[in-house]
Amino acid sequence: MREKPEGGKGMAEHTPLMKQYFAAKAEYPDLLLFFRMGDFYELFHQDARKAARLLDITLTQRGSSGGAPIPMAGVPVHAYEGYLARLIALGESVAICEQIGDPGLAKGLVERKVVRIVTPGTITDEVLLEERRDTLLMALSRSKNCYGLAWADLAGGRFLVNEVNSEEALEAELARLEPAELLLPDEDAWPEYLQQRNGVRRRPPWLFDADSGRRKLLAFFKLHDLSGFGIENNPQATAAAGALLGYIEETQKQRLPHLTSITMETVGEAITMNAATRRHLELDTRVDGESRHTLLGVLDSTVTPMGGRLLRRWLHRPLRLREVVRQRHAAVGSMIDRDLDNKLMETFRRLGDMERILTRVALRSARPRDISTLRDSLSLLPRLRELLNASDSPRLRVLYAELGEHDSTASLLVKAVAEQPPLKLTDGGVIASEYDVELDELRKLSNNADQFLIDLETRERESSGISTLKVGYNRVHGYYIEISKGQADKAPVHYTRRQTLTNAERYITEELKAFEDKVLSARDRALVREKLLYEQLLDTVGAQLEPLKRCAAALSELDVLVCFAERAQTLDWVRPELEHTSCLHIEGGRHPVVEAVREQRFEPNDLDLHPERRMLVITGPNMGGKSTYMRQNALIVLLAYIGSYVPASRALIGPIDRIMTRIGAGDDLARGQSTFMLEMTETSYILHHATAQSLVLMDEIGRGTSTYDGLALADAVARHLAHINRCYTLFATHYFELTALADETYEGGLSGIANVHFDAVEHSERLVFMHTVKDGPANRSFGLQVAALAGLPAAAVAHARRRLAELEQRGRESHVSEITPLALDAPQQCSLFASAPSAAQEALVALHPDELTPKQALEALYRLKALL
C-alpha cells in the first residue's frame, strides 16, 4: 500500500525534504525506508511508528510538513547494521536511501537515491547472515500438474531449480530448504500453510511466465539455449528461475557476477523425506523447537562455517546415488588409515569462510579483513595439496584437483594487504607498505606530522613561556594550539583564536595552518590512492572468481569428510556396506543422539529386514525403548546415505528411496487438524507413497480414537504396509492382538511379519527397563508401573490395579481376552460414516441356517452373492 503524505495536504504543501522522502517512498511502499540524513538513517510517518515498535527506539517528531507533525525515528549510521539485522530477522525488508555526493558541496537540497534493498532472502553482509545456515530466496511457479521451484543462496553464489508433481512433494522441499523469503504469483488457491509463512512476497503473475523467464535467463547468462543447465524442457522451473532472477536484479541494483550457472536437482537422486519425517527424526531441530541434542548437533565437528553449511545440506538430502556415497565412504576411510583427518583439521582451523568472502568480492562489498582472510586461506593451499597428493581415494583426488593452484593470487595479497588491516577502508592502512611508491610517499608526509607537532609544541612553549601549551587535532576544527584560560592572556599576538572551551582557548597560526593544509591534503590523497589500489585488488581477485569458487567448494567438502572421519573415530562408528540387493541388516546399532547425551552405557540392538521379513511388530512397555529403536535405525540409514560412518558394529544397507515416519502425537493448530486427524493424514501419505525400497516407522497407530476403531485401523495399516506396499516397516504398537499377524500366511506364503519386543523386570518394587530387543511378542505392558514412575499418586495407581483386575476377570468370563480389557465397559464411539445395512446384510439376517436343506442353502448363497 502506498504511503500518502499525512495532514490531508497535497505534495505542493510539503517541504522540499519531505517531497524528496515521499518520492523515494513511493517507489518502495511496502518496505521500510532508511533515509540518510547526516550521521543517521531516519524513518518517517508509518515507517517510523513501525520501526519504533519493532526496534524499541524512540518515536519523536521532526517539525511539521503539510500542516501536520512528522513522526520520526532514527538509527545511527555507524551502528545501523545491528538494527538492520533485527528487522531482517523479523521478516522485514528495507530500502536504503543514501546521500549522493558530498553534502558540504551541495547547493540546496542534497541529492538522495535508493542504492540498495535488503530483504530476508537477499542478504550478503556477514553481520546479517547466520554463519552455519544457508539464507535462501525461493520462487514458486505452477501449472495444473507441476510446481516449479527456483532458489538462490546469494551469499554463497548458488542458483538451483527443481520440479515436483504434488503438493506433498512441494511441502517436503520447503521443509528441506526452509527459504527465508518466498516469492509467489499473486493468485488464489495457494495452500494455506504457504500463505501463513513469514517472508512471503506476492508478485504479479506475469513475472512467472515461462517464455519471459527463459529470455531473462538467456540474457543474464549470455547463452543461446538452456540445455547446458538441463532445464530446456522444464517450463515451470524456468518460469520460477526467471521470476527469481528478476527479483534479485531489482533488489540488488548491480551486476551479479558470482551467479554463473544453474543446477537442476531431481527428486530421484535423493532419498525422499517429507516434512513430518524431518520433524520426527529431529535432524537439526527438535520437536520443541530447540536445536540442542539433534543429529546435526552430534555430527557437526566441521571447522569452517562453509563446511558446516554443506553438512546441513547433505543431512537434509541423503543421496540414492550409491557410487557417489561409496566414494565419500572411501574418502573417509582413506583419511582414517593415513591419519589425514587430524592433519587436515589442524590446517582448517586457520581457514576463513571463503565461499561468502568471494561473493562479497564479486559484489564489491568485501571489507579489508575479508581480503586478509582470503589471503591467509589461500596461503594454506600448498600445505593442503601436499597432504592430499598421495591419496588413494578417487574423491580426494578430485578434490585435490579442484583446489587448484593460486600461488600468484596469494602472493599478490601477501604483498598488497597489511598484516592486520583495519575494519574499514576509510580508516586507512589497508594497503601494505612498500607495495605502492606513491602511497608510501603520501604516508611518509602524513606520518612525519607527529614529529613536526612535537617540535612545534616545544618551540611554542619556549617562545611564549607557557609551559602548559599543547598542540592537538580534532576532526571538526583540525589542528590547534591550546592554552588554559588562566594563561590565555599570554597568547602571542600572531595567534588567531579558533575555538573557545570552558577551561581553555584554542588558536591557529599561519605556520600551523600551512602544515594542516599540507598534511590533510596528503591524508586525503593517500585515502584516494588506497581506495584505487583496493579496487584493483578486487578486480584481480574477481577475475579468478570461478576457480576460486571451485576451490572453496572443495575445501567445504574436505571439511565435511574430515568431520566424518573424526566422528567415526571419536564415537566408534563403522563404515556401512551399501548393497545392491534388498536388505537392512544392522548389528549393534545405537542411537547417535541418545548415546551422546546420556551418562549410562547405551544398549546396542540389532535389526534384520529382508524380502521375507519386511515388518517388525514391536511390543513392550512404554519407556522400554521402542521409539528410540525405530529412530536409531532410520538415522543409521540416513547417515549411511550422506557418506558418514554409522553407530553400529556392522551395517549392510540395501537401496532406500524414502524414509517415512508416523511418530508422536500433537495437534496441528495452524491447519485445524486434531491429533488423530494428523495421525491419519500422515498415515495416508505413507500408504499412498511407500514402495518396496522405503523404510517406514509407525509408532502407536490408532491410539487417538476408541479401542476398537484404533485396533481395526492399526490392523489394516499393518497389513497394507506388509502386503501391498511391501516396504521395510518398524511397527510399534500397544495392541497385543497385532502380534498374531506374524503367524498368518499371505497368498500361500509367509506374511513377511515378525514379532520383537522390549522387556522390563520388577526388582525390589522398582521397574527396570532392559532396553534390549528380543524376538517374539511382549507378555506384559507394565502400564501401571510406568504410571507410578511418572509420579501418579499412589491412591490412583492402587485404584487402577483393582480396576485392571476386575476388567481382566470380566474379559476372561466373556471370552474376549483378545480385546483390550478397558474397552469392555467403555461406550463405543460411533463412526462418522456409519451407513445403513446393505441388502445382502438384511438377507443374511433373515436366513435360518438350521431350517435349510443343502439345496436351499446353496440357492441362498447364490442369492447373497448376487446382492453384493
Curated annotation (Swiss-Prot):
ATP binds at G620, P621, N622, M623, G624, G625, K626, S627. GO terms for biological process: mismatch repair. Keywords: ATP-binding, DNA damage, DNA repair, DNA-binding, Nucleotide-binding. It comes from the Bacteria. GO terms for molecular function: ATP binding; ATP-dependent DNA damage sensor activity; damaged DNA binding; mismatched DNA binding. The keyword Transmembrane helix does not apply. Belongs to the DNA mismatch repair MutS family. This is DNA mismatch repair protein MutS. It comes from Xylella fastidiosa (strain 9a5c).
